[in-house]
Design a protein with these regions (language model features):
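Asp-based, Mg2+/Mn2+-dependent phosphohydrolase catalytic module
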Residues: 50, 62, 66-67, 71-167
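Catalytic-core regions built around general acid/base machinery
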Residues: 44-56
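A metal-dependent, Asp-based hydrolase signature
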Residues: 1-30
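Hydrophobic patch in the ABC ATPase nucleotide-binding domain
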Residues: 24, 41, 79
Length: 167
């Protein structure tokens, strides 16, 4: 098959389908899509990232999002001086949980998988990173139950402040 659509196109296609299914006026499409561009971090995130940076941790984003969207979000939230790298699946043309995605930081920094603390609020992301060999941490802000997957995270935290206690 070897077909690939970027995250923005997949999101747009999914939104089109949902809008039709729920009879939402198509004129709202761009307004809804643009909500992705104004996402803000949770209150503690910037403070914790700055503390990690002060401790000389390499900080990165590994996302299915497009580079342009990710860079826009980082810049609009004044985080561009905090992150060392933004890794987008667009570099390898395949979505997580393919191992090529998780290989990107390993290859760039020439580190072992276990040296990466991989955080996500998404259980599928946590499982993918953990099965790859990362030290996965589930950010469970809402006291949810972990999906029935073949992996359980090494750690579970309620917010990023708790991360400072476990690394």
């Amino acid at each position: 098959m070897n077909r690939h659509k970027d995250f923005w196109q997949v999101t747009e296609d999914s939104l089109d389908k949902s809008m039709k299914a729920f009879e939402i006026d198509a004129s709202m499409k761009n307004e809804l899509l643009n909500l992705y561009k104004v996402l803000s971090p949770f209150p503690e995130v910037t403070e914790v990232l700055k503390k990690l940076k002060e401790k000389n941790y390499k900080l990165g984003i590994l996302s299915n999002g497009t580079p342009s969207l990710l860079n826009e979000l980082v810049k609009s939230n004044n985080l561009d001086n905090i992150f060392d790298d933004i890794f987008s699946i667009e570099e390898v043309g395949i979505y997580k949980p393919d191992s090529k995605v998780y290989d990107m930081p390993i290859k760039k920094y020439k580190i072992q998988k276990e040296e990466v603390a991989f955080l996500s609020a998404n259980t599928w992301d946590v499982s993918g990173g953990g099965n790859y060999g990362y030290s996965s941490i589930w950010v469970n802000r809402n006291n949810n139950i972990f999906d029935n997957l073949d992996y359980k995270p090494k750690n579970e935290i309620k917010d990023l402040k708790q991360l400072l206690d476990i690394i």
